[in-house]
């Protein structure tokens, strides 16, 4: 598994299902994501980070922090000691474990899913969730808690604002470049359990697809 990316980087790439290398959802062949390292069916995207191979739709958001719905899909966190690839692995494993506990039906399950994601983002109580969800919820809460430090350092947790600021920065100035490099060494992107294709959140369906390909428990 080629999972070498330690920090969040600007690797702009619009999310385009018709782009070379992209696959349609539901395609039966499996691949190992070059970023999170997890077995994935269907849609894949070329990886412009370290290491060869395609990435899953979740990890692909690292490559375009200015996507139209990015503020609903991810937030910035501060965790220098935890590689970005590890964050993606932990997040996707927690999401799969949570979906596995909720069941495998696309209707009422999505409502519960979104309530759980909202509770994690807002710090609300999740006591009504099944006990089997506790481990996954604890991981997601611990990751989201690092938004506090990101906000203290950046005065924002919005990926688009950071990406815009970095793209506009005069990196030819040694001091600015050093500050930006130090910042990027510690900033990470944390997915919020949503992924939009236009107005539609397709992420719950993607998680179910991943579970169908690998139904074994992914977190205990």
Role assignments for model-derived ranges:
Residues 90-93, 97, 112-119, 139-142, ...:
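Charge-rich, solvent-exposed alpha-helical interaction surfaces
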Residues 15-18, 41, 80-86, 129:
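General structural signal for secondary-structure boundaries
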Residues 1-76:
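N-terminal cysteine/histidine-rich coordination modules
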Residues 6, 86-89, 93, 135-138:
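Exposed alpha-helical structural elements
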Residues 123-220:
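C-terminal, charged low-complexity interaction regions
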Residues 61-102:
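Polybasic, low-complexity binding patches
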Residues 3-14, 99, 108-125:
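Alpha-helical interaction/linker modules in multidomain eukaryotic proteins
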Residues 102-107, 151-152:
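Charged, low-complexity interaction regions
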């Amino acid at each position: 598994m080629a999972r070498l990316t330690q920090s969040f980087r600007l690797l702009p790439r619009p999310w385009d299902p018709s782009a070379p290398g992209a696959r349609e959802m539901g395609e039966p062949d499996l691949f190992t994501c070059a970023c999170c390292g997890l077995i994935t069916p269907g849609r894949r995207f070329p990886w412009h980070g370290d290491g060869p191979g395609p990435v899953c739709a979740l990890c692909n958001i690292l490559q375009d922090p200015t996507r139209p719905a990015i503020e609903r899909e991810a937030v910035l966190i501060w965790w220098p000691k935890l590689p970005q690839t590890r964050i993606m692995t932990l997040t996707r494993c927690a999401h799969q474990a949570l979906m596995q506990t909720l069941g495998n039906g696309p209707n009422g399950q999505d409502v519960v899913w979104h309530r759980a994601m909202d509770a994690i983002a807002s710090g609300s109580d999740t006591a009504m969730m099944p006990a089997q969800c506790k481990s996954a919820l604890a991981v997601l809460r611990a990751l989201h808690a690092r938004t506090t430090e990101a906000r203290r350092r950046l005065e924002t947790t919005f990926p688009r604002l950071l990406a815009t600021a970095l793209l506009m920065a005069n990196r030819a100035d040694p001091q600015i470049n050093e500050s930006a490099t130090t910042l990027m060494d510690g900033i990470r992107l944390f997915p919020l359990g949503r992924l939009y294709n236009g107005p539609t959140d397709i992420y719950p369906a993607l998680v179910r697809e991943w579970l169908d390909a690998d139904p074994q428990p992914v977190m205990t």
